[in-house]
Every structure is written in structure tokens, then in C-alpha cells.
Amino acid sequence: MLLRVSAVVLAVGLLSGCALFDSGPKPVASTYVTLSDSSAGYALLYETVSKQKRTNLLSYIKKETPELKALLERIAETSRATADELEALAKAAPPLNLTATRLPKMELAARESIEKDTRKDILESKGVDLEFTMVSSQLSGLNYAAHLARSLAAVETSAPRKAFLQRTDRKYSQLHDQVYKMMYTRYRS
């Protein structure tokens, strides 16, 4: 019996990355960021919502269900409003550069490759396959936008910007939940 318990504890420790045997608390990530880091975070958020604001253009080239069309329209409208508000906030002191994401070349290449594959999948699909591709790609984009806004809000010192980021987190989290619900109810087997 003792051997069995020891084996289970060892297996759990190995599978959990030995977190059970960790000797102390992990260091907390610094909440201090430079203006350059913060600006790059805002630029990433701006880039993300700028792409999301075009999601409703799919209806010009593809036929989608009314439910998907309405959902994509909500995402596009939320993203347009968010992009506009980001542009206004970027002009306030201290100003933000919404074009400098400062991503490494390999990250940029990976993102470009993913976008190219997703575009190809969307253009070549129809019906349920089209919907599933659109919904799954939106799911990851909305999740990223919500978490990026949340991370920026955690370090933002300007009250108006912090409030904007918290609203943005809530909006994109709600949209993410709506997309997830659609995906779960329509495509589970």
C-alpha cells in the first residue's frame, strides 16, 4: 500500500513538473513596465482589434448563416469602436505609438503564416466548414484581445486608460463567451 501511494505521489509530481516538490514561492512578474513596453502592448492590441474590425467583410464574398453574420457584425462593431478609442487614447499624454509592436522576426513570420493559412481555409470552405473555421479563428483572436487588455490594465497608471482597458477586457471576454457558446452548441458531435 505504501509503495502504491509513493508511486502515485511520484507520478503526480513528475506529471505536474515537480510543482509539488518546489521549495518556495515563484517570483511574481514585475508590474513595472517601461513606456516603450506599454506602448508595444497597446500597439499589439490595436493591431488585433484592427484585424477584428474587418470580420464582417466575409459576407461580401461568402454566404454565412444569419447567426454567424450577426456575431461577426458584433465583433466588427466592437472592434471599430475599440480601435477608435485607442487612437484617441494614443494622443493623450504620454503618447503611445500604435504601430510599433516590437515583435521578433520569427514571431512576425509565424503570425503571417497562420493568417495566410486561415485566409486560405476560409476562402476554400463553405457551409459548416466555413462557419467552423471562422468561429474557431475568432475564438483565439477574442481571447488574445481580452487577455492583452487585462495585462495592460494591470500595469496601467492612467485612470482613463485603465478604465478603457478594463472595459475592453470585459467586452472581448463577453464576445469570446458568445463565440464559444456558438461553437459548442453548433459543432459538438
Identify what each model region corresponds to.
Residues 19-189:
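His/Met- and acidic-residue-enriched segments that coordinate or traffic transition-metal cofactors
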Residues 1-7:
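Bacterial N-terminal signal peptides that target proteins for export
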Residues 14-17:
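C-terminal motif of bacterial Sec signal peptides marking the signal peptidase cleavage site
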